[in-house]
A protein has these predicted regions:
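Short, charged recognition helix plus adjacent turn
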Residues: 79-114
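A short, Lys/Arg-rich alpha-helix, primarily the initiator
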Residues: 6-31
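Helix-turn-helix DNA-binding elements, focusing on the entry/boundary residues of the two helices
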Residues: 25, 36, 47, 62-65
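Base-recognition residues in the alpha-helical recognition helix of bacterial helix-turn-helix
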Residues: 48-52, 70-73
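Short, basic-rich loop-to-helix N-cap that marks the start of a DNA-contacting helix
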Residues: 56-70
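Short alpha-helical DNA-recognition segment
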Residues: 33-51
Length: 114
């Protein structure tokens, strides 16, 4: 079996997440009773690329994944993946760095022109 370079250096949790995404896409397509050939045609990709997506292949561009999600009517949540509301670690770090007090900067002193 040939392994792509990206799957060799990719962290295990990321590989698992991509495989799960692929399975979820496959299951969503099946629930909608959309044959693979038609889903591929609607996404303007080959049937082979759709199979790769449904297996969670990391070599497929994220834009292609997004297009397939669009075909399935599921692209609306894609834009929220890294939104601040879904980032508890980032929100916690941001909260820890908030200043205790905010001071007004002194206005520059005017000098009299002679």
């Amino acid at each position: 079996m040939r392994t792509s370079r990206s799957s060799v250096v990719m962290p295990l949790p990321v590989r698992h997440a991509l495989r799960k995404l692929g399975r979820d896409i496959r299951d969503a397509r099946r629930r909608r009773r959309i044959p693979a050939a038609i889903a591929a045609q609607r996404a303007s990709i080959s049937r082979t690329t759709l199979v790769k997506i449904e297996k969670g292949d990391p070599g497929v561009a994220i834009g292609i994944y997004a297009t397939v999600l669009f075909v399935l009517g599921m692209a609306d949540r894609l834009g929220d993946l890294a939104a601040s509301k879904n980032d508890p670690v980032g929100l916690q770090l941001e909260e820890e760095n908030l200043p205790q007090r905010i001071r007004v900067a002194p206005s520059p002193k005017r000098t009299k022109d002679k």
